[in-house]
Amino acid sequence: MTNFVFIVADDLGYADLGCYGGREPISPVLDKLAANGIKYINGYSNAPVCSPTRFALMTGRYQYWVRGASEEPMADNAIGNPELGLFPELPTLPSLLKDKGYHTALIGKWHLGYRPHFGPEKSGYMHHFGPMSGAVGYYSHTGTNKEHDLELD
């Protein structure tokens, strides 16, 4: 089986990386990875913030057809809300790959709904290392609710 890795970054512009025309040598490892692999040059995000984009990438659906894509990142009541997140019954890229025998892992923030109703393992990931929320202190690992938010399974 072919291995592949999706690298998704928040707030990254088209020409921020050297492999896409950036002038500053800030991404030599990613540039080398792109030079020795497949580099896509025609992909766009149709949302200005991160969570709706991840909803779309994970499901292959227009993100605003999936309840929670526009509400979850902004809602004060998102934590523990059973209606704001990526519903486990929706097929996702990781769940389809897992069904085909791939090992799946998410390294980084989930920010697609909170436990116990949602989570990476409910959407096809076998392993997760990172926060559930979208804003976590770099050193404290606490979320906006001031609780510890860093998982390793």
Short names for language-model regions:
Residues 1-153:
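Formylglycine-dependent sulfatase
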